[in-house]
Amino acid sequence: MPHSDELDSRDVLSVSGLNIAFHHEGQQVDAVRNVSLRLKRGETLTIVGESGSGKSVTALALMRLIEQSGANVRCGEMLLRRRNRQVIELSEQSDAQMRRVRGADIAMIFQEPMTSLNPVFTVGEQIAESIRLHQGASHEEALAEAKRMLDQVRIPESQAILSRYPHQLSGGMRQRVMIAMALSCRPAVLIADEPTTALDVTIQAQILQLIKVLQQEMSMGVIFITHDMGVVADIADRVLVMYQGEAVETGSVEQIFHAPTHPYTQTLLAAVPQLGAMRGHSLPRRFPLISADEPALYESQIEQDTVVEGEPILQVRGLVTRFPLRSGLFNRVTREVHAVENISFDLWPGETLSLVGESGSGKSTTGRALLRLVESRQGEIIFNGQRIDTLSAGKLQPLRRDIQCIFQDPYASLDPRQTVGYSIMEPLRIHGLGQGDAAAKRVAWLLERVGLRPEHAWRYPHEFSGGQRQRICIARALALNPKVIIADEAVSALDVSVRGQIINLLLDLQREMGIAYLFISHDMAVVERISHRVAVMYLGQIVEMGPRRAVFENPQHPYTRKLMAAVPVADPSRHRPRRVLLSDDIPSNIHKRGEETPAVSLQLVGPGHYVARPLQDNALSRL
């Protein structure tokens, strides 16, 4: 049915009176109520709001994927102008018609790449499939275009990445693959649902720049869903603010940032962490407290002086972790990924040490090596005076209750067949620390501590938003009262208000229980707030390490300074010229078998502040 007379000539998408409902155990739950929006060619509309506000549900409705989640569009109109200028009503299209529309005319980058990529196909085959389907290219042409797209999203060793599987890539790498796949067919409308959540600030800056360039080339309309107000200020033309399933405010990016009218918008902006807010303070501090009824903020003056002097709870000495890459007729190991190269550090009780760096720098691998989820090539890991890198699985089991983890991808961490209450209770049952009513009460308490309701224990992971799933993972990590928590991007999927609540919770638990955190993150504003010390990683090596104040206020290494310069500012009037932050020749940590990485030498430049000495033949010297 033609609808061209109902869509403005400049619009590529129009949504009017959209209402979406979920059906659960015979009950109807309204997730989105009366949402309307318009998107013009070449325009970027950002949708912001708390986790569970209906942002992602709205996007899934536009892709006609909402039915797979047990929801339906109750009423409303969704008009799309295809690349051939034909205007269609999305809700009237059959499944076969939508398969032709998705990817070619409207594409989506999802928040959790591991659940969006097929684990049994290589990266190259998955990107090439979309190109073959919508562009009619041959297999060879599609693979060549897939490599070009990987180059565009700045994945090093793109030819090698084509033959690798999703589980062999870091979270940030997987997200870049998703972005390459979505942009490969140059759609008329791109929906990006938290596309840079898993990316470090430098790659985030490059990806945002790439989307802008492609948007201008193709006059592509972009709907950008995010909780990062710095990103909103950087890329948005207009902003739609959602709260509890409704659009509460819309306007230009300047109007929203400089003259917000709705109390929720004012509260949302006030809660944004600002890089530099900790200048002059040496110890971690809680985020400002937000009242739901009063946008004014109250900043706690309590500093987190929790570090216990004496012996470190965790010691790492000369850790090396490498992964083999096989190729050739006989599938022999010909190259290796030098993921972690000769790193050493200590972690004291009650301390937060943050690992920062780009995707693929070795941060997550370091955390997994400490948990013995991957085996290290060499080095020592000493926990509470006991060497654990040589322990058998049986002897390691009792120690696991003292070292817990929060992973980057919450959906992959939760069993989809079990209720979240069962998943939280499982560590208690395994370690014999509770069962029956006592365990149920513990689960209810943990859910409340992370901002969820006790009755959520009976729901399944797919019934929660990405941010809510991450809170469930945090509750599970806290169940055993651990001495050390390794948090791998633990708050990256959370909106700003919930992020502040979770960081405050982690700080409270650290003060009450003396927990030590190894905090892996690319969010420099959060790292600045929570850290006692910071270690900067690049290509598997630590290039700068020291007290948080010294590293942030006086960064010595060129790479550290580039990380700081890439952080987006949550103010559209303060755009900083952000050039491409890394050279076009991206160094790679993939080496021939037997080839050794030159070790960096750390120099003491201040109290506890160490910086890598550049080497002539080292990638660090080319930064």
Curated annotation (Swiss-Prot):
| Superkingdom field | Bacteria
The name under which this protein is listed is Glutathione import ATP-binding protein GsiA
**What EC class is this?**
translocase
Q: What is the lineage of its organism?
A: Bacteria, Pseudomonadati, Pseudomonadota, Gammaproteobacteria, Enterobacterales
**Record PANTHER family:** GLUTATHIONE IMPORT ATP-BINDING PROTEIN GSIA (PTHR43776:SF15), TRANSPORT ATP-BINDING PROTEIN (PTHR43776)
Family annotation (NCBIfam families): PRK10261.1, PRK10419.1, PRK11308.1
GO cellular-component terms in the record? plasma membrane
User: Which reactions are catalysed by this chain?
Assistant: glutathione(out) + ATP + H2O = glutathione(in) + ADP + phosphate + H(+)
